């Protein structure tokens, strides 16, 4: 497909609490657009506070897509996201609106823009066996097993990232080939859309201060009550969605394993670490234009105008790359 035939997107990325949603709403209002969510947790219904979903007032200003589309017991994957996002983008474009993608889930952004690794579909039996094995040898034991057959993928993963460790082992057991080989063959080279990627750069201590404030606000807004309601609806704490940051710690609090203060401190710590991992991911991605927000909003608007009118090359020239979050 020729570049001029591709739908133009503006994708806003960056770490949690960096101000992505606010910037996306302001740009969508300015350019008559709609927003497609690319946050892996905001797709879940009933998980509002802990996922920092856009407020009702923000969503009333601009139409948002792919929020509250599945229940917490659904394992919503990057491929599921890509299919849903492709549909939302086509719908928005067909009505003559601009498309803005916003979210901090790097894999979702990559899947949308460059496609996914052509690896085999999941095998529930193998996955179940690996989950049982994890109970015996722990996450570190699983990672060691992966290192023996796929050291490249093992090097990329943290031992607590059980889902991806099991997925890589699952692929190897199915095919006899390491996941890293599938990734190398794919190359993440296919460009699906014409996209201007804007990354919000926030100074480290300021970002961490925002993280702590956001967590305090979540707790004050009723995060524990939200988790209690999820329990009441029958969603168990071992679900993938319930093991995410904020929910797993409150589950431990409600089960009497830790105090509320301990839960809050753990959420803050884990969110800071998550923000650091997000920045590491996005710093390695090609073509992100890093901006200061809200200070440079007028400049951002000018570059978005140039991108929509003339293409990406002219728009990319004056953006600078940030340093990593230490």
UniProtKB/Swiss-Prot annotation:
It comes from the Bacteria. This is tRNA dimethylallyltransferase 2. Substrate binds at residues 16-21. InterPro entries: Dimethylallyltransferase, IPT, P-loop_NTPase. Its cofactor is Mg(2+). ATP binds at residues 14-21. GO terms for molecular function: ATP binding; tRNA dimethylallyltransferase activity. It is an enzyme of class 2 (transferase). One of its GO terms (biological process) is tRNA modification. The keyword ATP-binding applies. Monomer. HAMAP family: IPP_trans (MF_00185). Pfam families: IPPT (PF01715). It catalyses: adenosine(37) in tRNA + dimethylallyl diphosphate = N(6)-dimethylallyladenosine(37) in tRNA + diphosphate. Coiled coil: none annotated. Residues 39-42 are annotated as: Interaction with substrate tRNA. The record marks 105, 127 as: Interaction with substrate tRNA. Keywords: ATP-binding, Magnesium, Nucleotide-binding, Transferase, tRNA processing. Belongs to the IPP transferase family. Catalyzes the transfer of a dimethylallyl group onto the adenine at position 37 in tRNAs that read codons beginning with uridine, leading to the formation of N6-(dimethylallyl)adenosine (i(6)A). Its EC number is 2.5.1.75.
């Amino acid at each position: 497909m020729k570049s001029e035939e591709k739908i133009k997107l503006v994708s806003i990325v960056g770490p949690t609490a960096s101000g992505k949603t606010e910037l996306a709403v302001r740009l969508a209002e300015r350019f008559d657009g709609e927003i497609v969510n690319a946050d892996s947790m905001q797709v879940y219904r009933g998980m509002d506070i802990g996922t920092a979903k856009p407020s009702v007032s923000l969503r009333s200003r601009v139409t948002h897509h792919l929020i509250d589309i599945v229940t917490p017991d659904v394992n919503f994957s990057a491929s599921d996201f890509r299919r849903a996002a492709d549909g939302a983008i086509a719908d928005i474009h067909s009505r003559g609106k601009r498309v803005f993608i916003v979210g901090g889930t790097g894999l979702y952004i990559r899947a949308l823009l460059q496609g996914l690794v052509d690896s085999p579909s999941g095998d529930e039996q193998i996955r179940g066996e690996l989950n049982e094995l994890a109970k015996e040898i722990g996450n570190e034991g699983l990672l060691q097993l992966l290192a023996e057959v796929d050291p490249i993928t093992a090097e990329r993963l943290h031992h607590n990232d059980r889902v991806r460790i099991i997925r890589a082992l699952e692929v190897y057991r199915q095919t006899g080939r390491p996941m890293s080989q599938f990734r190398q063959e794919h190359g993440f080279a296919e460009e699906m859309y014409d996209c201007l990627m804007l990354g919000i750069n926030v100074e480290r201590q300021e970002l961490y201060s925002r993280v702590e404030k956001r967590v305090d606000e979540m707790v004050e807004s009723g995060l524990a009550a939200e988790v209690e309601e999820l329990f009441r609806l029958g969603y168990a704490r071992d679900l993938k969605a319930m093991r995410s940051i904020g929910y797993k710690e409150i589950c431990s609090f409600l089960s009497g394993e830790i105090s509320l203060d301990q839960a809050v401190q753990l959420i803050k710590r884990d969110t800071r670490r998550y923000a650091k991992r997000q920045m590491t991911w996005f710093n390695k991605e090609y073509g992100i234009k890093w901006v200061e927000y809200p200070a440079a909003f007028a400049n951002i608007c000018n570059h978005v105008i140039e991108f929509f009118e003339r293409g990406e090359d002219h728009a990319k020239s004056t953006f600078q790359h940030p340093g990593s979050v230490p």
